[in-house]
């Protein structure tokens, strides 16, 4: 009997977890994409949220997640994911990951963020990649241009115009925060495959919810000042020393408060001068800031909100299946209602591990087989991506209203860019227009309150 071939697009935490779990079950696995160090998982500083400490519980973590998500989370999904926290922890530690401490972050009732010197991704990703290679996972470097689908049936993926045939494909290529002008994530995370599968009949979910990290630092490039710095006691202040927000509120509230102060013409700073042993607790941030001429033990740190995490994505079920047989999505590429309207800090790495393990079980159970051997190929070039970034930043950013969103739609029509990227941007704007309320990461100044009639997820169907 021939081995089942599984192609995983993306080598971040979700992709590597799925690859290892599938390879351990005997599947022929390939990871297709850039180096794993070019993933947002690798950049993850704080850590992974796990309710494993004394006094904490799955129930409390679930309640924190739903409160942060402003009550439109899929509660069954939230329970499913968080109840697998011990399995996620055991998977990581059994493969050589050693956590060095626990931190408190905004929205959490307990210091349940398991971290590795606040450089968690840089430690986890190389360890898992080493294990994947030892299991003979095939790493194919390159840019997946599109998913090969023929009349609703999966054929594989296209790499430089060549169809690589697989029985199952798992999209683990991250979200689309790179479609915003300012992001601390990987700039290549532009959601191309999210738009690709949408054009081919897969609905998108909750696309209006884009999370902005409150404390980005723009220097030689854009960096994140991890939430854990505020958890350790850093304060947010204006240039004249005014404190204006609870630093440990959820990210949507803090980001919006900072943005409003900036609209008043006030600079906003992070004051970390009261943190003892900053250099030892946050070595990466310390080295970055010193390289930019700032000593966080003596100086205020200028910050700005930046696009950080896209809550919406490819609509999947509890088993990470799309509506196309053999096609799955996990991690930030996917959306099944876990985060609701706003992601609780450090829940993303938990979702990456859990979704990677769960999709491996799903594929092992269903054993899909490729039914077609070819598919149409249409990729040419990406086009004017920077203009999309400007439109989304200016018209579908931290604060929105009907006029600005409609103006963004108008500008979008004039941009010469790959239709799939235009579709992702259109999904964000139209979903934001339809949600005539403010909830979580989506804030409409013309509808500044939550409304009961919008207490549900949104779905975007490109052909409707």
Swiss-Prot record:
CC cofactor: FAD
Highest taxon above the source species: Archaea
Major site of localization recorded for this protein: cytoplasm
A Pfam short name: FAD_binding_2
Subcellular location: Cytoplasm
Enzyme Commission number(s) from the entry: 1.4.3.16
Reaction equations catalysed: L-aspartate + O2 = iminosuccinate + H2O2
Cofactor remark: Binds 1 FAD per subunit.
Coiled-coil residue spans: none
Keyword terms of this UniProt record: Cytoplasm, FAD, Flavoprotein, Nucleotide-binding, Oxidoreductase, Pyridine nucleotide biosynthesis
Gene Ontology terms describing biological process: NAD biosynthetic process
Site feature Important in orienting the L-aspartate substrate, where: 105
GO cellular component, one term: cytoplasm
Residues bound to FAD: 11-14, 40-47, 332, 348-349
GO MF assignments: L-aspartate oxidase activity; nucleotide binding
Catalytic center residues: 251 (proton donor/acceptor)
Pathway linked to the protein: Cofactor biosynthesis; NAD(+) biosynthesis; iminoaspartate from L-aspartate (oxidase route): step 1/1
Record family assignment: Belongs to the FAD-dependent oxidoreductase 2 family. NadB subfamily.
Function (record text): Catalyzes the oxidation of L-aspartate to iminoaspartate, the first step in the de novo biosynthesis of NAD(+).
NCBIfam families: nadB, PRK08401.1
Protein name, as recorded: L-aspartate oxidase
Species for this entry: Pyrococcus horikoshii (strain ATCC 700860 / DSM 12428 / JCM 9974 / NBRC 100139 / OT-3)
Gene that produces this protein: nadB
